[in-house]
Swiss-Prot record:
InterPro entries: Chromosome_initiator_DnaA-like, DnaA_dom, Hda, Hda_lid, P-loop_NTPase. It comes from the Bacteria. This is Uncharacterized protein HI_1225.1. Belongs to the DnaA family. HdA subfamily. One of its GO terms (biological process) is negative regulation of DNA-templated DNA replication initiation. Pfam families: Bac_DnaA, Hda_lid.
């Protein structure tokens, strides 16, 4: 039996809207901001490939709510093996609910029913903004419960547009700057050409390099990066 963890209440981390590169997704960001201050559309479905920024965006909005003394919860459904559907109870009392990686629980009858019920409770309460992310569009998910399938299309649906290589370099350099070190164009370009191009992989590498450079008191030269990442 899997160990059941308590409700995964979100704590503030370093994901912000300022370090989310939103130039490719301005319509989505504008609509989210408008609804966070004046709730007219409570449901948003955001989909895209791995590393496209879905998790960052959901956590950033959660952070913004919490920093402004508003109630918010982020639920990583990719870790649903560690908690039960009870985590969704009473979430209609929150101002913001973020369900990340919906595809992780699709096909599970208990989870599909629990999310369907949450949709209905949020619609009835009229006080909650619900953000859902997945790796596919609603029509491409193999949802078993027809009523949930229809609920997923109730609100606004957006595909996160992927970043160009040039934009990825800017994102990495901004993240490095916020951590207190510099990432040259040459080194950043080396990273995106030698590693998988999804931002999740690139940020993991950046975190590793940050710790290694601090410990070794070294700048992030290409030879040093090669050594640390075994490239």
């Amino acid at each position: 039996m899997n160990k059941q963890l308590p409700l995964p209440i979100h704590q503030i981390d370093d994901a912000t809207l300022e370090n989310f590169y939103g130039d490719n997704n301005l319509l989505l960001l504008d609509s989210l901001r408008k609804n966070s201050s004046d709730l007219k559309q409570p449901f948003f479905y955001i989909w895209g490939d791995k590393g496209s920024g879905k998790t960052h965006l959901l956590r950033a909005f959660s952070n913004e709510y919490l920093i402004n003394q508003r109630t918010a919860i982020y639920v990583p459904l990719s870790k649903s093996q560690y908690f039960s559907t009870a985590v969704l109870e009473n979430l209609e009392q929150q101002e913001l609910v973020c369900l990340d990686d919906l595809q992780s629980v699709i096909g599970n009858d208990e989870w599909e029913l629990a999310i369907f019920d949450l949709f209905n409770r949020i619609k009835a309460s009229g006080k909650t903004l619900l953000l859902i992310s997945a790796d596919k569009s609603p029509s491409a998910l193999s949802v078993k419960l027809p009523d949930l399938n229809s609920r997923l299309t109730w609100g606004e649906i957006y595909q996160l547009n992927s970043l160009t290589d040039e934009q990825k370099i800017k994102v990495l350099q901004l993240a490095a700057y916020q951590r207190g070190f510099q990432l040259s164009d040459e080194t950043a370009n080396f990273l995106i050409t030698r590693l998988a191009r999804d931002m999740h992989t690139l940020f993991e590498a950046l975190d590793l390099l940050d710790k290694a450079s601090l410990q070794a008191q070294r700048n992030l030269t290409i030879p040093f990066v090669k050594k640390i990442l075994n490239l």
